[in-house]
């Protein structure tokens, strides 16, 4: 997905938390890939639409000291959020540990509501929990 609403997704697109303390640069040469929601316990609560990038596809431009790590259950996935404003920015995925999921709502000038319907992953019945 290379355009969301009127916003062209840049090959290197900036993402920020709400307060601006955390700034990321995402490598998105193919636009937003795999936009989705998840119905696991944490994703239901944060409600974000998420895209994916390779582990080397996120660069922290500023605010690394504001990023806090949250883990639960198997402690495999690593969820990061801004300790100042509380916004979830990205996570290292449990189902694909070679990828980060990122909060599409953090992309500069992108309104995730312009994406429309997206697939919802079954995080309640995650294969790693069987």
Ranges and model annotations:
Residues 1-16, 21-130:
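A short Gly-Trp-Pro
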């Amino acid at each position: 997905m290379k355009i969301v609403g009127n916003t062209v997704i840049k090959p290197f697109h900036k993402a920020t938390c709400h307060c601006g303390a955390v700034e990321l640069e995402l490598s998105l040469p193919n636009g937003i890939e795999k936009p989705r929601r998840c119905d696991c316990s944490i994703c239901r609560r944060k409600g974000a639409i998420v895209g994916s990038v390779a582990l080397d596809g996120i660069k922290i431009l500023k605010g690394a000291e504001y990023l806090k790590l949250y883990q639960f259950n198997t402690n495999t996935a690593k969820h990061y959020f801004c300790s100042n404003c509380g916004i979830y920015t990205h996570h290292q995925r449990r189902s694909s540990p070679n990828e980060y999921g990122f909060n599409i709502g953090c992309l500069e000038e992108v309104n995730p509501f312009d994406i429309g319907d997206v697939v919802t992953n079954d995080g309640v019945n995650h294969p790693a929990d069987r």
